[in-house]
């Protein structure tokens, strides 16, 4: 039987070949002091972050950017308006409380749809159920 030349072809689909243990071991970072740094899974880091922010009471949106936003919106409605610092603080607290509640409802909508990732449609549904316009 005669030999024929085989030309290289592009592969479409299928599983990628697994990386060997040598390449995985070479990728690990070893600190100078000799101890191997434990790397946490992304899901456990996310859960740790959720617990941290649920325990805390400090505001999550920075003060100065929020203040600039409030002043910018107020300038469009009524120029030369002044704010007391207590008024901006009250607006800040109210805005964060609203956002936290909205994200909680959005998360419930995502869970109801048997998902763990929130999507814009979850937020739209949460706002519609709340009866908000806009």
UniProtKB/Swiss-Prot annotation:
Residues recorded as bearing Phosphoserine in the entry: 11
Family (UniProt): Belongs to the histone H3 family.
Residue segments, region Disordered: 1-25
Entry keyword set: Acetylation, Chromosome, DNA-binding, Methylation, Nucleosome core, Nucleus, Phosphoprotein
The protein's role, per its UniProt record: Putative variant histone H3 which may replace conventional H3 in a subset of nucleosomes. Nucleosomes wrap and compact DNA into chromatin, limiting DNA accessibility to the cellular machineries which require DNA as a template. Histones thereby play a central role in transcription regulation, DNA repair, DNA replication and chromosomal stability. DNA accessibility is regulated via a complex set of post-translational modifications of histones, also called histone code, and nucleosome remodeling.
Organism per entry: Caenorhabditis elegans
Entry keyword Nucleus: yes
Record GO cellular component, one term: nucleosome
UniProt modified residues of type N6-methylated lysine: 5, 10, 28, 37
Main location: nucleus
GO MF entries: DNA binding; protein heterodimerization activity; structural constituent of chromatin
Cross-referenced PROSITE patterns: HISTONE_H3_2
Modifications after synthesis and translation: Acetylation is generally linked to gene activation.
Subunit structure: The nucleosome is a histone octamer containing two molecules each of H2A, H2B, H3 and H4 assembled in one H3-H4 heterotetramer and two H2A-H2B heterodimers. The octamer wraps approximately 147 bp of DNA.
Protein's name in the database: Histone H3.3-like type 1
UniProt-listed InterPro entries: Histone-fold, Histone_H2A/H2B/H3, Histone_H3/CENP-A
Residues annotated with N6-acetyllysine modification: 5, 10, 15, 24
Localization of this protein: Nucleus; Chromosome
Domain of life: Eukaryota
